[in-house]
């Protein structure tokens, strides 16, 4: 969509029409060009901050903010930020903790690269649901490991599973969704709000982990993150449509219609 829209936006309409005809034929190309022109007309017309408070747009922006905050509040970053404490509680010494931290970084990198191939093959919605559901189950197991005082390799295996699940789903796909769900006329402002919300959520997650861990213990903390992932799964299932192979205009219409 970005290449196609870019051609229209830079007056390379013949190139855009050629691309669209190759995709879906003459009638499809004409419909898409008309839809794109209408979208750009809205984008270039005068808009104010009050447009963000239109009820239908507020629901879309609210969904975007939820997606951004959920990417952080799913809890995975506490594993990166507090890896020493987590592995220490699992019975590892200093050398073991350092090795495990290196392994978690490698797993994160590998499965981030995997996401490059799966985002268009599997779709955005299935990957977001896989990530939230997978983390929910993984946290339930990890919390149980701490509750029953299981230590060593089993805890490492569960932690690596959580990191792999996050790296190929919620971590990259959140940014893909946020770039696609907003109407052109408010996309810049809406993205700014979502990015701000994401970093605020990251800060809150980081500063609350230790107090929560003291109050609930390692098991209760990860069970709590599991409940948050359950809530995220339910909201994503109910509110987020599949955006794969859809134009930005189709996504906008679907979201405003459902909202």
Predicted segments — roles?
Residues 1-21, 34, 40-259:
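Alpha-helical transmembrane bundle of multi-pass membrane proteins
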Residues 22-32:
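Short intracellular "coupling" helices and adjacent cytoplasmic loop segments at the cytosolic face
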């Amino acid at each position: 969509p970005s290449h196609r829209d870019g051609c229209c936006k830079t007056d390379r309409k013949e190139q855009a029409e050629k691309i669209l005809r190759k995709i879906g034929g003459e009638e499809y190309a004409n419909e898409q060009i008309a839809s794109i022109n209408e979208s750009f007309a809205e984008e270039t017309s005068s808009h104010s901050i009050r447009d963000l408070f239109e009820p239908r747009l507020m629901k879309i922006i609210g969904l975007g903010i939820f997606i951004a905050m959920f990417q952080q509040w799913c809890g995975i970053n506490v594993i990166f930020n507090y890896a020493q404490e987590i592995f220490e509680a699992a019975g590892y010494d200093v050398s073991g903790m350092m090795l495990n931290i290196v392994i978690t970084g490698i797993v994160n990198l590998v499965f981030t690269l995997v996401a490059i191939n799966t985002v268009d093959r599997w779709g955005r919605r299935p990957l977001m649901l896989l990530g939230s559901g997978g983390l929910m189950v993984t946290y339930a197991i990890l919390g149980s490991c701490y509750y029953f005082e299981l230590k060593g390799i089993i805890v490492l295996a569960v932690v690596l599973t959580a990191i792999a699940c996050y790296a190929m789903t919620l971590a990259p796909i959140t940014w893909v969704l946020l770039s696609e769900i907003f109407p052109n006329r408010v996309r810049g402002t809406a993205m700014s709000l979502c990015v701000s919300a994401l970093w605020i959520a990251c800060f809150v997650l980081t500063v609350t982990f230790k107090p929560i861990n003291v109050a609930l213990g390692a098991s209760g903390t990860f069970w709590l993150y599991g409940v948050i992932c359950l809530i995220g799964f339910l909201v994503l299932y109910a509110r987020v449509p599949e955006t794969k192979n859809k134009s930005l205009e189709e996504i906008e219409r679907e979201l405003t219609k459902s909202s």
